């Protein structure tokens, strides 16, 4: 058995052992989320891939969407959800004093907003 099948089988066992009914994967357009979502799709179990742009370069969003569409065409167990989070991020940012708006804090806030969105799904 090749490595990708071993990982995919392990993921399927994890889903079963934890009594879960689907994988939920945030897809950014990068290699990590592409590999993870593909391995999860290979299980044959339900997978929801989620695109969550926040003031994102359209090219980066398109990489993610193209990957999701490829996954959906190759594997019938894939659902795609796109949630535009820019307005949610801006509203949150408006409620935080501007003195805390440094680049690192804002980048971490984007990541945490995406994380909590995935938990809601």
Language model features: what each stretch is:
Residues 1-121:
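ATP-dependent adenylation/nucleotidyltransferase module used to activate substrates
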């Amino acid at each position: 058995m090749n490595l990708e099948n071993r990982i995919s089988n392990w993921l399927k066992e994890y889903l079963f052992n934890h009594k879960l009914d689907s994988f939920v994967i945030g897809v950014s357009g990068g290699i990590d989320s592409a590999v993870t979502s593909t391995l999860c799709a290979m299980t044959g179990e339900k997978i929801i891939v989620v695109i969550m742009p926040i003031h994102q370069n359209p090219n980066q969003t398109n990489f993610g969407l193209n990957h999701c569409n490829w996954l959906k065409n190759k594997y019938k167990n894939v659902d795609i959800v796109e949630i535009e989070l820019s307005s949610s991020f801006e509203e949150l940012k408006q409620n935080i004093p501007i003195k805390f708006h440094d680049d690192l804090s804002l980048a971490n806030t984007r990541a945490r907003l995406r994380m909590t969105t995935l938990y809601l799904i």
